[in-house]
C-alpha cells in the first residue's frame, strides 16, 4: 500500500502491475529525453544569434521530424498494446467474484459458491482497532486465493463507480447496466488496499476496498466457514 511522502508507484504484487511499472519507466525515459531536447533547443534559440532567415525549405529536416516522432510513438504503442491484451486475457479462472458498487459501499458475490455474498462497508474512525488504517479498513474483506487467476465482474446498482486496487494494477469502471471484467493474480499473500476511483457523490471518499490474499487451503477453510 502507499505510505506518507511516497513519490513512486506502489510495490507490484501481480504480473500485470510489474509490466505496468516497467512500461511507466520506459515511457518516462522517452518523455524525459524529448523534454531535454526541447529545452536544449529553446535555450539555444534564446542565447545565440544563429538564425537562418533565408531558408525557404528544408526537406531533410522535415523528413527527420516526421519519421522520428512516428518511431517514438511506435515504441510507446507496442508495449502498451501488449499489456492491454494481457489484461484482457483469462482462460479458465479458478474463481469468479461479482462486485457491485453502491452509494457508498461495495457488495461481493462468489458465484462459484452457493449463498456466499456480503456487503463491505468502511469502518468509521471511531471504531478502528489499534493499528487500523483510517478510511481504508472495512468490516468484510474480500478473501481470495493467491497465485490463482480470479475473474472480477464489476457493475453498479446506481451511479458510476470505479473498483481500483493499485498494487494489483487494477482499475475497472462500475457502470449501471453494464458488466465489466478484470483479471487478477497475486504473487504473494497479504492485505491490499484500494478505493473507489470515480467521483460518485458525497461519500465517494468512504468506499475503501480490502483484498486479503491467502493460500488456497486457508481460502477453502474460509469459504467453508462462510457457507
From Swiss-Prot:
Mitochondrial matrix side: 46-59
Gene Ontology CC: mitochondrial inner membrane; respiratory chain complex IV
Topology feature Mitochondrial intermembrane, residues: 1-14, 88-227
Keywords associated with the record: Copper, Electron transport, Magnesium, Membrane, Metal-binding, Mitochondrion, Mitochondrion inner membrane, Respiratory chain, Translocase, Transmembrane, Transmembrane helix, Transport
EC number: 7.1.1.9
One Gene Ontology MF term: cytochrome-c oxidase activity
Subcellular location: Mitochondrion inner membrane
Main location: mitochondrion
GO biological process, one term: ATP synthesis coupled electron transport
Residues involved in Mg(2+) binding: 198
Enzyme class: translocase
Entry-linked SUPFAM superfamilies: Cupredoxins (SSF49503), Cytochrome c oxidase subunit II-like, transmembrane region (SSF81464)
UniProt cofactor note: Binds a dinuclear copper A center per subunit.
Catalytic activity: 4 Fe(II)-[cytochrome c] + O2 + 8 H(+)(in) = 4 Fe(III)-[cytochrome c] + 2 H2O + 4 H(+)(out)
Topological relation to the membrane, as annotated: Multi-pass membrane protein
Annotated Cu cation A2 binding sites: 196, 198, 200, 204
Record-linked Gene3D superfamilies: 1.10.287.90, Cupredoxins - blue copper proteins
Pfam families in the cross-refs: COX2, COX2_TM
Annotated residues for binding of Cu cation A1: 161, 196, 200, 207
TM helices/strands, residue ranges: 15-45, 60-87
Cofactor(s) recorded in Swiss-Prot or TrEMBL: Cu cation
Subunit structure comment from the entry: Component of the cytochrome c oxidase (complex IV, CIV), a multisubunit enzyme composed of 14 subunits. The complex is composed of a catalytic core of 3 subunits MT-CO1, MT-CO2 and MT-CO3, encoded in the mitochondrial DNA, and 11 supernumerary subunits COX4I, COX5A, COX5B, COX6A, COX6B, COX6C, COX7A, COX7B, COX7C, COX8 and NDUFA4, which are encoded in the nuclear genome.
Protein family: Belongs to the cytochrome c oxidase subunit 2 family.
Function statement: Component of the cytochrome c oxidase, the last enzyme in the mitochondrial electron transport chain which drives oxidative phosphorylation. The respiratory chain contains 3 multisubunit complexes succinate dehydrogenase (complex II, CII), ubiquinol-cytochrome c oxidoreductase (cytochrome b-c1 complex, complex III, CIII) and cytochrome c oxidase (complex IV, CIV), that cooperate to transfer electrons derived from NADH and succinate to molecular oxygen, creating an electrochemical gradient over the inner membrane that drives transmembrane transport and the ATP synthase.
Protein's name in the database: Cytochrome c oxidase subunit 2
Natural source organism: Cratogeomys castanops (Yellow-faced pocket gopher)
